Amino acid sequence: FICVGKEEIIDYVTTSGTLGDPVTFVLTSEDLDRLSYNEFLSFTTTGCTRQDILQLMTTIDRRFMAGLAYYMGARELGMGVIRVGNGIPELQWDTIRRIQPTCGMVVPSFLIKLIEFAEKNHIDYNACSMQKCICIGEALRNQEFQLNTLGQKIHDKWPALQLYSTYASTEMQSSFTECSEFHGGHLQPELIIVEFLDDNNQPVAEGEAGEVTITTL
């Protein structure tokens, strides 16, 4: 539902539509500030500082909320940002060579494509400037917080690259991000309340699977 006048709406986005028709969401200026703050917290959780340069390997348009959020959060932290967008491995590697970014924001399966391109073109990716990637959209770890098949495949090829997993959704406009312990995403308690509920809307026991239920603050 929308609880402000249309003149208060600054940004229109939609969900990805993975499980059905995309759902439209709208944001006010204050919502965008909150979004920026969430990503600021996510970047600091991964250890990023204003000394880092972020290569943004996701779209910032196409009704995608998170691309703009990453840029705004990095700006709030004071990082340099290179808005390369998604795809085009040749452009990604040219950017890494030219600007020497230290951190990437990327869908992890695209890292496989970057590795394949580098190997075909004799690029020593383990010696490049990229130290870490914050990964979105796909799981990197299993329930025991060990790297899954995708995460392990990347790590085996590119062991010098730290992989940080995230969990987020358009609906909650917040994210859970790993720290350097790589043992699960951190809740941002000033932004959301999270519950894990059963079919009767009751909290599940410790270790049981439940519906992730978010209340935004």
What is each stretch, according to the model?
Residues 1-14, 20-37, 41-45, 49-51, ...:
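Nucleotide 5′-phosphate-binding alpha/beta core
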Residues 15-18, 54, 104, 168:
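Conserved S/T- and glycine-rich ATP-binding loop of Class I adenylate-forming
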Residues 49-51, 127-130, 160:
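A general structural motif
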Residues 77, 99, 129, 158-159, ...:
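Short, structured coil segments at secondary-structure junctions
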Residues 101-150, 164-172, 195:
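Adenylate-forming
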Residues 145-217:
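Conserved AMP-binding/adenylate-forming
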